[in-house]
Amino acid sequence: SELVKMRRLGLEPIPKLNFATTHDIWLKEYSRMVSTDIYYRVCADLIEEVSALFGKPRFFHLGMDEELASYQTRQDYAVVRQNDLWWGDLYFFIGEVEKNGIRPWVWSDYAWHKPDVFFRKMPKSVLQSNWYYGSGFNLDSLKEPNRTYVKLYDDLEKHGYDQVPTGSNHSVPDNFESTVDYCKKAVDPSRLLGFMTAPWRPTLAHCLERHREAIGQVVRAMKKFER
């Protein structure tokens, strides 16, 4: 299987199913049944099946980013959970992952918009991935909203969350290495579980060069990190 092939190459496959309503088109008709009994049964079955297929991986990424109306203006069908419903569904997903003996993992951008609520309600057991794809990291000179995006790395550290900071070559070519440089200083090593790159290009032939560039950036950042 593909998972066996990946492991033979020394890679650790981690499942990711994004349950945010902005990104759940993969659920097909069930994406239009959000927060119903049928939806919860389907999502629980999916999490259990994927957990078994991946052989009880260390982590399970649940997505949960960008669930705001502003991110869905180009979609013909838009739905947004918020307030207690969003948190209730997140806790449901977390519980289903933990039932399978796996640590849940989410994107952290909810904290950009409602930091007080986030830090009051987000369990420390959930691995966090803040993301920022720009080129500047100086909090003294950054303008909003970029300053908020970068500062969240520091805020997650201040509140004691484990992190996998995320960079990208989606917008600029130097972001990933700069992300590593910044977070190596901002995050305690005991809470820095790694880094992730997200080129946000499909795995198609015409995008191959962008993926190669991303891999090269990771390699360069690793060499600098290990010095």
Predicted stretch roles:
Residues 73-80, 136-145, 208-210:
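Short, flexible/disordered intra-domain loops and linkers
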